[in-house]
Amino acid sequence: MGDFDGEQKELIKKLVNFRMIDGKRTRVRAIVYKTFHRLARTERDVIKLMVDAVDNIKPICEVVKVGVAGTIYDVPGIVARDRQQTLAIRWILGAAFKRRISYRISLEKCSFAEILDAYRKRGISRKRRENLHGLASTNRSFAHFRWW
């Protein structure tokens, strides 16, 4: 990981760690770098594209289930910065896996397509973010139950 700043290194490390299955880090790192090479064909600065894609998917608010007097409410709340990035990466990778199952193509191509869609504010992960924000705005009347 050449001349990246701390935040960019952390993003790449999270990408690798979230995708890793059975501790096969070198295999996953190769997939991530192949995805970056595909992205480099379309855009000059791959890391900036990745950071922008994650920023476009980051949720601002989320809902938490809270039980009050025997009733369960979806209570909206603000998401911490680290959790925003974690959720965004998790959603992008989940959408790539979903594409892989649907279309039967390689994981590099699916990741490439989903990252580009996230950068362009489209795709499965962006839709998931919009659904979460819609749920939070629908349940904003229960915000007074937020005491954690």
Swiss-Prot record:
Oxidoreductase as UniProt keyword: no
Family matches, as InterPro entries: Ribosomal_uS7, Ribosomal_uS7_bac/org-type, Ribosomal_uS7_dom, Ribosomal_uS7_dom_sf, RPS7_plant
GO cellular component entries: mitochondrial small ribosomal subunit
GO molecular function, one term: rRNA binding
Compartments in which it is found: Mitochondrion
Keywords: Mitochondrion, Ribonucleoprotein, Ribosomal protein, RNA-binding, rRNA-binding
KW Plastid (keyword) present: no
Main localization (coarse): mitochondrion
Chain's role: One of the primary rRNA binding proteins, it binds directly to 18S rRNA where it nucleates assembly of the head domain of the small subunit.
PANTHER family recorded: RIBOSOMAL PROTEIN S7
Subunit structure: Part of the small ribosomal subunit.
Family: Belongs to the universal ribosomal protein uS7 family.
Protein name stated in the entry: Small ribosomal subunit protein uS7m
